C-alpha cells in the first residue's frame, strides 16, 4: 500500500534523525 509505505518511510526517517541527533 502506497500510504503505508509513506508512513513507514516517515517513521524510518524520524528514527534516523533521532540517531543522528544522539551522535552530535
From Swiss-Prot:
Keyword entries, A-Z: Amidation, Amphibian defense peptide, Antibiotic, Antimicrobial, Disulfide bond, Secreted
Protein's UniProt keywords contain tRNA processing: no
Location relative to the cell: Secreted
Residue numbers carrying Arginine amide: 24
Signal peptide: none
Species this chain originates from: Phyllomedusa tarsius (Brownbelly leaf frog)
Tissue: Expressed by the skin glands.
Gene Ontology CC annotations of this record: extracellular region
Its biological purpose: Antimicrobial peptide. Active against Gram-negative bacteria E.coli ATCC 25922 (MIC=1.5 uM) and P.aeruginosa ATTC 27853 (MIC=23.2 uM) and against Gram-positive bacterium S.aureus ATCC 29313 (MIC=11.6 uM). Has no hemolytic activity. Associates with and disrupts membranes in vitro.
Effect upon mutating residue 23 to S: Loss of dimerization
Protein's recorded name: Homotarsinin
Description of how the protein assembles with itself and partners: Homodimer; disulfide-linked.
GO biological process: defense response to bacterium
Metal-binding is among the record's keywords: no
Amino acid at each position: 500500500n502506497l500510504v503505508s509505505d509513506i508512513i513507514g518511510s516517515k517513521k524510518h526517517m524520524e528514527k534516523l534523525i533521532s540517531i543522528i541527533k544522539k551522535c552530535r
